[in-house]
Structures are given as C-alpha cells and as structure tokens.
Amino acid sequence: GQAQRIKVACVGNSVTYGYGIENRETNCYPAQLQQMLGDAYEVANFGHSGATLLNKGYRPYTQQEAYQKALRFAGDYVIIHLGLNDTDPRAWPNYRDDFVRDYLSLIESFRKANPRCKVWVCRMTPISHRHPRFKSGTRDWYWMEQALIEEIARIAGATLVDLQEGLYDRPDLLPDALHPNAEGAGILARTVYGALTGDYGGLQLPAIYSDRMVLQRDQP
C-alpha cells in the first residue's frame, strides 16, 4: 500500500493565505513549500486574512472556519505564523496580557487534534516602516510580541522558526509594507522547509532549536 503522506498544516493570517500575490494558489508560501517538500507531504493552507491570535482581537483566528478546517485536518506538522494583526491599537493595548495564554491554548488544541503532531512557532515577518500604522505604537508592540513568541516556543516545547530574518532587509519584497510578494513567499517557504527538514540548502539562516532538541552534528 501507499505510505501515508505527512500532513503539514500552515496556520496563519494573510501572509500565510497569500494576500496580494499573483496566482496565489501556486505562489503563496504553503504552495511553494508543497513544491519543495514533494509528494511524501500534503501541505494545506489554513491562512485567514486579518486574523488575530488574540481571542479578544477584532478577528480571532479561533473563530474562523480556517481554524475548524485545520483542526479537522489534524496535521502531523503544524506551522503557526500569527501576531501581525495583534500589533493593532484595537488589540494589543487592551488584551496583550492574554497573548501568551491564547497562543499556548491554540498550540494545545492542535496537539489534542493530533497528539503526535510537531509544532513550529514563527517569529513574525517584518512590517516595513512605510506601513501607515507603523508609527502609532505598532513598532514597539511588534518587538514586544516577537519576544513573547520566542518565550511561547520555549514554554510549549515547540520549535521556533524565524520568518523575519529572510525578509528583514528586503522591503522590495513587501510591496505594501506588510504582505510579501511571490518571491518573498518563496523565501518564507525555503525558511520553513529548512526548519522542517534541517536542510537549509545553502540559505544562511540562523537555525534556532528548541530546548528539547539535541544537536548531534557537532558531537565527536
């Protein structure tokens, strides 16, 4: 019989969905990731534009159909990239104390759906200073969130993936200051591919390992 394909759930907001990308179905980061991983994997896009991580945000991910579909999919690998929409005056100032708890309960819900699943938590893609909201406090909130996301990965025993690094000095790949174009989505796909497989393909990105992982490579 045919071996079971490894199911990869890409959970997120408009960046995962592929908002603004030409030929989104083939060029969004989950679709490009599918191309890289090949037939042994089934990658599914559960991105929802405008979704907040915060359950009291203005568009909570956990209240979207994409979330219910992701739970039913019960991915073996779950990649979560949320938080950009929480850097909003409607969300962060009022509800930031819920961020860690809401994130941990989201992770837990995927582990309930598939107790064997592995979870990757993503540092957020950049918001360019050209973004209209950037000066309102969003910039400071963004960095507060990045630090919390690192903490969340540690507490949850999930692996951290840095989606900021590859796009940080490439504002040209963020035409509207927030959403990556197809080339930018390709960088995200390569970064996630590296995190899932340990193969960074010559892409010099810092590999960030969770406390639970032991690096064998440097052992004598």
Question: Where do the language-model regions lie?
Answer:
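Low-complexity, Pro/Thr/Ser/Gly/Ala-rich linker/spacer regions in secreted
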Residues: 1-4, 194-204
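Conserved SGNH/GDSL esterase-like catalytic core that processes O-acyl groups on lipids
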Residues: 5-9, 15-104, 140
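Residue-level detector of flexible, active-site-proximal loop/helix-junction positions
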Residues: 15, 50, 126, 167, ...
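Alpha-helical cap/lid subdomain in secreted, periplasmic
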Residues: 61-198
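Non-catalytic, glycine-rich low-complexity segments
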Residues: 201-220
